[in-house]
A protein has these predicted regions:
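Long amphipathic alpha-helical scaffold segments
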Residues: 2-114
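Beta-rich catalytic cores
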Residues: 63, 96, 123-125, 132, ...
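Short coil/turn segments that connect the beta-strands within blades of beta-propeller domains
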Residues: 64-65, 132-134, 179-181, 233-234
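Short, conserved, GDST-rich strand-edge loop motifs in beta-rich repeat architectures
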Residues: 69-95, 141, 146, 184-201, ...
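Beta-propeller blade signature
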Residues: 98-104, 150-155, 199-212
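Multi-bladed beta-propeller domains
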Residues: 108-122, 153-170, 209-223
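Structural WD40 beta-propeller signal
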Residues: 130-132, 175-177, 221, 231
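Beta-propeller domains
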Residues: 220-241
Length: 241
């Protein structure tokens, strides 16, 4: 409410409901241990989940008609999440039930429509929408059996693979830069994580032109770089192991 004022009219109500839930779970005064039953705790957790969903969906920043998302089957290997010493190239190349979808309107009863579905069993993820909203980047297995970066128009047309000249290199997790170029991670410099005997191929940051050319290595880390994201001031935020 302090940030959005009248655009978020129920902010105080959400805070009050949160405080009531916290009070329900608080131990009695003078006691170091909670005495609530498992049923009471489970009920409070369910109420907290409902409150969280309601409060977040009411955020004015979600005041748009469509939401781009990845739908992944719950039987996907590792849910498509590598271990914390790995990156995408350590994931299985099959066993997924993925697709890029659009939710409209953006609410629980909105309709999901498929924008892109890869070949059966393939992973698709790391979606990054262009500033214009007219196209997007994403990662999946390319035509040479390696992880590659693809671009797709927002209407589902114009699929093209941007990386993949080298037969033994994986590239993924890309984002658009304000100058039109693309930042991404790649295993092209052939480094492995030492504490797992090198079997986790390290991906670090690279940059390329919009068409996939003029690739330049930006980081020379021993361990992984993950999730590059452009901030509002043009700087790049990323995670590193």
């Amino acid at each position: 409410t302090a940030t959005f004022g009248p655009r978020y009219p129920r902010g105080k109500e959400y805070r009050q409901r949160l405080e009531l839930l916290a009070a329900k779970l608080a131990p009695p005064e003078g006691s170091r241990e909670a005495v609530q039953s498992r049923e009471a705790v489970a009920q409070a957790q369910a109420e907290l989940l409902d409150l969280s969903r309601e409060a977040q969906l009411a955020n004015p920043l979600l005041d748009f008609d469509k939401l781009l998302l990845v739908r992944r089957g719950n039987q996907a290997p590792k849910l498509g999440l590598p271990q914390n010493w790995q990156s995408n190239s350590s994931l299985p190349q099959s066993g997924f039930d993925d697709e890029i979808m659009v939710l409209s309107p953006v609410r629980p009863d909105g309709q999901l429509s498929t924008l892109f579905r890869p070949r059966p069993g393939q992973f698709v993820g790391d979606v990054d929408l262009h500033f214009s909203s007219q196209k997007m980047l994403f990662s999946m297995i390319g035509d040479n059996g390696r992880w590659q970066i693809f671009e797709l128009n927002s209407d589902g047309s114009g699929l093209r693979q941007l990386t993949g000249e080298q037969p033994d290199v994986d590239s993924y997790d890309a984002c658009y830069l304000p100058d039109g170029r693309i930042l991404f991670t790649s295993t092209a410099y052939f480094v492995g994580v030492p504490c797992v005997y090198g079997n986790s191929h390290v991906a670090t940051l690279y940059r390329m032109d919009a068409g996939g050319g003029n690739i330049r290595q930006l980081c020379f880390d021993q361990e992984h770089d993950w999730c590059p994201t452009v901030l509002n001031n043009g700087r790049v935020l990323y995670s590193r192991w």
